[in-house]
Amino acid sequence: MIEIEIRDINNNIVGKKEVPDIVFNNSASESVVHTAVVAYMANQRQGTHCTKTRSEVSGGGKKPWRQKHTGRARHGSIRSPLWRKGGIVFGPKPRDYYIQLPKQMKDTALFKALTMKYRDNEILLLDNLSLNRIKTKDMVEILKNLQLEESSVLIALPEKDEKVLLSARNIPYIGVVRAEDLNAYHVAMFDKVVFTVAGLDKLLSIKGVS
């Protein structure tokens, strides 16, 4: 078990929490994080890109000039890839980029990414994060108290919190996710990861870690 400090929004230590080694002291290879991030990014692609080959470009059915005795190079179509506005050779066509990973590999990648953050002192555990109103200024003040104003920060909450979400929405370097939606890509994209105690408990519960 690993013991991690619990802080309040004023950056005061208010307690400690024991977390299983698998979460913040995972021994898996770092390559699993790379695999998970590549898969996540590939799965975001629409794959709707499309170019036309010489047979699909409109026009070009007529031979532009006769084969011989013109002094010019021989051509059979103005839609040859050699011509301006001609077809594309080996261009992209619509395809599915989806990469399916086993659930266990995704979980391992997430825990390994969290382990890497923890070893770099980039994990913060808060007792609670709640706002009385929707106010960006209030969220900025909390980040300053936690000395996070110069870092990109991912906040993992147990449930969707409109006040936190809307207060953080206008801050370009802040991300807010539900703990159950957290993945290795999210963790890798931000400098710091902030959990609430309830958010971390929710993550452990969903992943079956005790």
From Swiss-Prot:
Keywords: Ribonucleoprotein, Ribosomal protein, RNA-binding, rRNA-binding. Residues 63-76 have a biased composition (Basic residues). The gene is rplD. Belongs to the universal ribosomal protein uL4 family. One of the primary rRNA binding proteins, this protein initially binds near the 5'-end of the 23S rRNA. It is important during the early stages of 50S assembly. It makes multiple contacts with different domains of the 23S rRNA in the assembled 50S subunit and ribosome. Forms part of the polypeptide exit tunnel. GO terms for biological process: translation. InterPro entries: Ribosomal_uL4, Ribosomal_uL4-like, Ribosomal_uL4_dom_sf. This is Large ribosomal subunit protein uL4. GO terms for cellular component: ribonucleoprotein complex; ribosome. GO terms for molecular function: rRNA binding; structural constituent of ribosome. Part of the 50S ribosomal subunit. HAMAP family: Ribosomal_uL4_B. The lineage of its organism: Bacteria, Pseudomonadati, Nitrospirota, Thermodesulfovibrionia, Thermodesulfovibrionales. Residues 49-76 are annotated as: Disordered.
